[in-house]
UniProtKB/Swiss-Prot annotation:
Keywords from the UniProt entry: Phosphoprotein, SH2 domain
Segments of skewed composition (Basic and acidic residues): 29-40, 73-82, 160-176
InterPro entries with a match to the protein in the record: SH2, SH2_dom_sf, SH2_domain_adapters, SHD_SH2
Role: May function as an adapter protein.
Protein name per Swiss-Prot or TrEMBL: SH2 domain-containing adapter protein D
Entry-linked SUPFAM superfamilies: SH2 domain
Length: 343
């Protein structure tokens, strides 16, 4: 019973729960040594050990002539030598690099013996003072000597080989081949009966042949390339085997008073409608100029590209006559001209 009361009613003594360890905020030995060394490195010479400023020394002189106090800064020897080289006058000789920071302790460096080596800046200044020579891109092993011998005599034959005077086809001949041999050989060749002077064969650029002349005096119904009422499919059938630039004029299927220009391009057949302005002028598209009649428009664009999108590079070159529609496919495709093949 006593054990039950002690365990369940907490009437007996109870142990406290475990507590986390108490943090130690004391400074370690390594950190303390580092801090002391840091204070020594950046010690102010005008302060005492307690960090208080030293009292000013009062003298009998005028205080306005007292020099201000300066802090001492540790300077490396290499930095001091570099600063002296930058701040020194141009005519001053550079001093030798030493381990001391005091410039008064450095001794001037004796001039080094001439070993043939020169700094790039000095070499550039020396080369600018000397007369400029042509830049030599490569070494010539047979370079002639520019200096003459002291005795005044001839400097001897040049080591550079003489240019080979033989033609390209006679490299197998001996070295003693001379000009007279070449002259005689070419004279016999040129004076022969079979020699003919042929002009230089230059390839002239091919120019397209001009289109067939369109007679503007004839009416539209009497033009050979006017087919009258013709369906779209029949026009495409006629132009399917024709060359690029072939054309015909036909009447529309839906509206008999409208004329259509059927044209063969590199992408197939194109059908363009002729329109009339208020002044009864004929135009072909928005960018076409007005013309009095369709034959005059066809004559104009037989020598100029059409102002129609998709046919800017085309002209009305090859008319498809009405007689060809009764004979069958376009006979112009049977004999393609040079530079133009079947589309």
């Amino acid at each position: 019973m006593a054990k039950w009361l002690r365990d369940y009613l907490n009437l007996g003594s109870r142990r406290p729960p475990p507590q986390p360890p108490t943090p130690d905020y004391t400074e370690s030995d390594i950190l303390r040594a580092y801090r002391e060394q840091k204070d020594l490195d950046f010690e102010d010479p005008y302060e005492d050990s307690n960090g208080r400023a030293e009292p000013e020394v009062t003298g009998s002189g005028d205080p306005k002539y007292n020099s201000p106090r300066h802090r001492l800064i540790k300077v490396e020897a290499a930095d001091m030598a570099r600063a002296k080289a930058l701040l020194g006058s141009p005519g001053e000789e550079p001093e030798a690099e030493t381990e001391y920071s005091d410039p008064f302790d450095a001794q001037p460096q004796p001039p080094a013996p001439n070993s043939g080596y020169m700094e790039p800046y000095d070499a550039r200044s020396v080369s600018s003072e000397q007369p400029s020579r042509a830049v030599q891109l490569y070494d010539t092993p047979y370079e002639e000597q520019a200096t003459k011998p002291e005795d005044g005599g001839s400097s001897g034959q040049s080591r550079r080989p003489l240019e080979d005077e033989r033609p390209a086809d006679e490299y197998d001949q001996p070295w003693e081949w001379k000009k007279d041999h070449i002259s005689r050989a070419f004279a016999v060749q040129f004076d022969g009966p079979d020699w003919e002077r042929t002009p230089c064969s230059t390839k002239e650029p091919w120019r397209p042949q001009p289109a067939e002349r369109v007679d503007t005096a004839l009416a539209l119904e009497k033009q050979p390339w006017f087919h009258g009422p013709l369906s779209r499919a029949e026009a495409e059938n006629l132009l399917s085997l024709c060359k690029e630039g072939s054309y015909l004029v036909r009447l529309s299927e839906t509206r008999a008073q409208d004329c259509i220009l059927s044209l063969r391009s590199n992408q197939g057949s194109m059908h363009l409608k002729f329109a009339r302005t208020r002044e009864n002028q004929v135009v072909l598209g928005q960018h076409s100029g007005p013309f009095p009649s369709i034959p005059e428009l066809v004559l104009h664009y037989s020598a100029r590209p059409l102002p129609v999108q998709g046919a800017e590079h085309l002209a009305l070159l090859y008319p498809v006559t009405s007689s060809q529609s009764s004979q069958g496919p376009c006979t112009l495709a049977a004999k393609p001209e040079r530079g133009q093949g079947d589309p």
